[in-house]
A protein has these predicted regions:
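PAPS-dependent sulfotransferase catalytic domain
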Residues: 88-208
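PAPS-dependent sulfotransferase catalytic core
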Residues: 1-71, 128-151, 155, 206-258
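Glycine-rich phosphate-binding loop used to anchor ATP phosphates in small-molecule kinases
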Residues: 68-92
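Short, flexible loop/turn elements at secondary-structure junctions
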Residues: 8-11, 81-82, 111, 189-191
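Acidic-histidine catalytic/liganding microenvironments
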Residues: 24-25, 81-82, 179
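Structural motif
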Residues: 3-5, 76, 103-105
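Short, flexible loop segments at the rims of nucleotide/cofactor-binding pockets, characterized by
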Residues: 51-57, 80-83, 160-161
Length: 258
């Protein structure tokens, strides 16, 4: 039975994707398992997230994934939880020989809108939020150098995170797309009628495509000034992510424990 997971940053449409998969796969897709007893078992806790991003895919992280996978039913299963790809999802699918039954959805979003969403929601206002949900520039294992971003003040960390996740998505595509089935899509494509239809076709799902209404929209709208500020900074950032990642892989970078 097929299992569906995401490689995505968060604030990228994962809640909407949950509704899409629920409607079109005919199952109760999971967004984020947030019960008290889920953390450390079905949902990575802060220790798991920090361990992977400081030490790599060590034994502690691998034990979490053994628990996680053992609780997944032997049926069609979909989980759009964006924390999973930041603590060893892809590596541990391979370690547990689950690659043949897995489809990974590489979900991206316009980087300006993505960054603005983090800022408006204060997602990086407390270090524990970065530890549990996102990434922190102080982590040892990372692809993008955070130092230039830190010069930007309060917007530096969320902007660095956008580029770090873009690089990680590219890393997993370049390194593992010949081992695990991956579908790459943007939120902007996915939420259009034609894009949703095409994605539905890629998933080889029977029946008509059902397009759900928007989810998890922020009622606090960003100012035009903030959007313009982030747009101008992004325009000045000249980085070839595919080439950077190719060079990084060639230099021996890996998220496996060393």
């Amino acid at each position: 039975m097929k299992k569906y997971f995401t490689i995505t940053a968060g604030r990228t449409g994962s809640a909407w994707l949950t509704s899409f998969l629920t409607a079109n796969l005919g199952i109760a897709a999971v967004h984020e398992p947030l019960g008290i007893d889920d953390f450390g078992v079905n949902m990575p806790d802060i220790r798991t997230m920090r361990s992977f991003n400081n030490y790599g895919n060590n034994d502690f992280v691998k034990e979490f994934w053994k628990r996680k996978f053992s609780n997944i039913p032997d049926a069609i299963y979909a989980e759009t939880n964006h924390t999973l790809c930041k603590c060893g999802l892809v590596e541990n699918l391979l370690w547990n020989k689950l690659e043949d039954e897995t489809i990974l959805i590489v979900l991206r979003r316009n980087i300006v809108k993505q960054c603005v969403s983090y800022i408006v929601r204060n997602d990086f206002s407390n270090i524990t939020l970065a530890w549990q949900w996102y990434l922190h520039p102080a982590y040892r294992v990372k692809i993008i150098n955070p130092e230039p971003f830190m010069k930007l003040g309060g917007i530096g960390t969320p902007l660095w995170y956008c580029y770090e996740m873009s690089a990680r998505q590219e890393y997993y595509v370049q390194k593992f797309s010949d081992k695990i089935s991956m579908h790459q899509v943007t939120l902007e494509e996915l939420t259009s009628d034609t894009g949703a239809q095409e994605f539905h076709r890629l998933l080889s799902v029977p029946g008509n495509c059902i397009v759900p209404s928007p989810k998890n929209e922020n009622r606090a709208k960003p100012s035009e000034q903030l959007i313009q500020q982030i747009s101008e900074i992004v325009e000045k950032i000249k980085v070839d992510i595919p080439q950077l990642v190719e060079d990084t892989i060639s230099n021996g970078f890996s998220f496996e424990a060393t």
